[in-house]
């Protein structure tokens, strides 16, 4: 194989998009969509950019009537902390493989320093912000919700499929995710309509389309019509992504038994926090909408679920959970709180740090607060989180 173009300038009329995710020390997932039916598609993977000395997946079938021409490859037995390149071989045409290639880097379970970008609220798949992110030296991108703004209010899986296709096919976002592995948790506009919850008409279709299109980490609830909460680690950092939409009860209900997470997910979340103690000095909770807010100040955040927020906050304090921070989206702003305003437990003191990062491609808006370091609404914004872990007692984190 011969590499002809920079990775961010490649095009191939046979491939709509490629993206990777679910990256661990020795595994990764690549999902792609092609523009024609084929009964012989395989993934070519190499540690070399020109794809020399490659390994090959088993052959897959792409059929518009069977799988929407989607192909997903689960990669195993990879080497830790290693850069990989990949491409699709379609109909045994080896010459076209390097026309459209992507890359990802595996992680390590040992202490490691790394940086990643995070952001939310992407109404458009095009914009200079995606190209700026692509030029950062990052290990992955964390999308914290509203990957698209289709606001689908019907149980029509083809509408959800089209939403992913429109955002990824031939767009700046698609090029970013081809070359930067991602982790992604939805919020309301990409799960269902505005402010949506478990009563959304398209709940089942949304869940299934996510599992079809997104190269996600294993879903602890299983597969099929299930919530999409998941977790993964990079070195000694544990990431916990909660599904704040598809199990949530309506926020305007008057019952004190309202829930964001649902009983099963909440038990899983608490257990993850307990299991992390002594193993992961840093825990990153990806919570897609505002935690810091008071009832009457917002229309969709945790302020409408004060009893459950208090329960979770008390659990964190009572179990002496250390090293927790939160990444959030939904609000179209950059905002940081150092813990001054995030404690909703019955015990006085500081809470955990909170970082909102957005909007990628949406006009600015302010939600929640107050935030100790201020809030800055705007479009074309994202965050960076840098982790320095030398294996000692402390891990240094910088948000910017």
Segments (PLM) and residue ranges:
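Metal-dependent phosphoester/phosphodiester hydrolase catalytic core
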Residues: 4-400
